[in-house]
């Protein structure tokens, strides 16, 4: 248990930051899931539209430190490859 005023404040700040990070991570995962569901249906147009919406969300999560920049780039790249493979 925090005893000092500064430690109590840090506990509050950490709780607030954790809630924000959890929300952002959840939002990113939701957009990724929408792309994956569109890929599963086999509709390339719908999958491409979902990817165009998801890509900025994934990169925004990286910008805020939710995931590493390389991790975000890899996610986008792999999703794009899967969307592209639908046509083949």
UniProtKB/Swiss-Prot annotation:
One of its GO terms (biological process) is translation. The keyword RNA-binding applies. Keywords: Ribonucleoprotein, Ribosomal protein, RNA-binding, rRNA-binding. One of its GO terms (cellular component) is small ribosomal subunit. Pfam families: Ribosomal_S20p. One of its GO terms (molecular function) is structural constituent of ribosome. The keyword Ribonucleoprotein applies. InterPro entries: Ribosomal_bS20, Ribosomal_bS20_sf. Binds directly to 16S ribosomal RNA. Belongs to the bacterial ribosomal protein bS20 family. HAMAP family: Ribosomal_bS20 (MF_00500). This is Small ribosomal subunit protein bS20. It comes from Methylorubrum populi (strain ATCC BAA-705 / NCIMB 13946 / BJ001).
């Amino acid at each position: 248990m925090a005893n000092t005023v500064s430690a109590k404040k840090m506990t509050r700040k950490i709780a607030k930051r954790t809630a924000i990070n959890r929300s952002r991570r959840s939002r990113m995962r939701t957009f990724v899931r929408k792309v994956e569901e569109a890929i599963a249906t086999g509709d390339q147009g719908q999958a491409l539209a979902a990817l165009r919406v998801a890509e900025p969300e994934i990169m925004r999560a990286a910008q805020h430190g939710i995931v590493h920049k390389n991790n975000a780039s890899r996610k986008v790249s792999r999703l794009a490859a899967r969307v592209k493979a639908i046509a083949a």
